[in-house]
Every structure is written in C-alpha cells, then in structure tokens.
C-alpha cells in the first residue's frame, strides 16, 4: 500500500527540516531531480498536520500564478461584482499553512522578488492587485526545492538564496531504497526489487558520467516501473516508464544495455 512517508538513510535530513520549520526558517531543498524533495515536503506537511499549497515554477510563472487574480462573480443579490481569488502564496499566508515552491530555479529571476517581504522577517506582502496588506498567520512556512544542473534551470539570485537555509537531498540506495519501493509501490517480490536497485545503481553511474539525464534515474521513475513490473515484463515496464520518455537515441541505447545486463 502506497504512503507518503519520506525515508532517508540520513535521518538528519528530515529532523533538521522539521526543526527549521519550528524555528520559522525558510527551507531550500537542494538535490538532483527525482531525489524525493517533494516527498519530503509532503511528509513534513503530514507530520506537522499543516496543509501545503504548491507552486510549480516555470518560465511562464507570473504574479497572478503566485498571488491570485481578479474575476467577475455573481453575488447573492444576482448582480455581478469583481472579486479577487487568492493564489497559493496568499492562501498559505492567511491560513498559516505551508507554501511549497517546486523547482524555484525554473522561474524567471524577475518574477520572484515580489516574495522578498514574505521570505524575510516581515512575513508580509502588499497585494499589488488589490492593495491589501497580508500578514502571515502563525504556522506559515516556506519550503522551496531546487534541481541542481537540470536543463532549463537558471542561476538562483543570491539575495533570494540568502533568505533560505539549505538542506541537501541526495538519492537513496540499498536497503533504504528497497524499503521505499515496498512502501510506495505495489511490488513485493524481493528478488525483483534487488534487481531493480542494481539497475538503478547503473543508471546513476551513467548519470554521473553524463551519459543519460537525471530524470531517468529518479525515484519517481523507479516507483512507476516497480508498479508496472507487477502487471508486465520488467523490460516493457522500463520501456514505458524510462526509455520512451527520452528523445536521445544514445541515452535510450545506454539504458537498453543496462537492461540486458541486469535482467
């Protein structure tokens, strides 16, 4: 049965993150794509019993995506009026919830300074669309995630980075990875799980050597292929979850070679 528990051999990763939240510090989770950063944020949200509002950054991210937007609604009297619909930042601030900013280094640098007051000691924001001054309610926390060396990422502004405390989140392996597969996928065959772990080790080696992209060795992909391995041959599961996502034929062939070696 799948669950949302975050597992890491280094227990200080989760414990430190929880302590930083209790100190009201902004947390920047730094690590390769698919290493479990979002899973860590979700587990912190569950553990602290605090809902999480997520922003998925891209070059198209704008102030409305962060703060909200104006729209026309019909009120109780049947007449129309302009109202402002709060976005994830303002919702999290008003409710004292967690704000999770995923892939923060995918956003254009000029988009994020609007959050400066939210991220420093003021914990305050003046909504440029309404003029409303929003003060963060007790319990409000900010967690951001940054993918290191991923295609499309931009250098993170130093002034922005200085508003966070950084926690490195690396890939998991060995018996810890085995536990994750058992807990978060439908696969229970120990022999197959060990083969998948060895296969993943080979993928990570190729990632470090620059032969394949990081996404191919991600925990997400591993969980997906483990699920599919319960209903189809492992070779086809890998084809569906990893190989077919890649555009580069050399990367595809490198993974096919690893499949032949491990299965």
Swiss-Prot record:
The keyword Nucleotide-binding applies. It holds the Pfam family AAA_5. The keyword Lipid biosynthesis does not apply. GO terms for molecular function: ATP binding; ATP hydrolysis activity. SMART domains: AAA (SM00382). Keywords: ATP-binding, Nucleotide-binding. ATP binds at residues 31-38. Belongs to the CbbQ/NirQ/NorQ/GpvN family. This is Uncharacterized protein SSP1341. It comes from Staphylococcus saprophyticus subsp. saprophyticus (strain ATCC 15305 / DSM 20229 / NCIMB 8711 / NCTC 7292 / S-41).
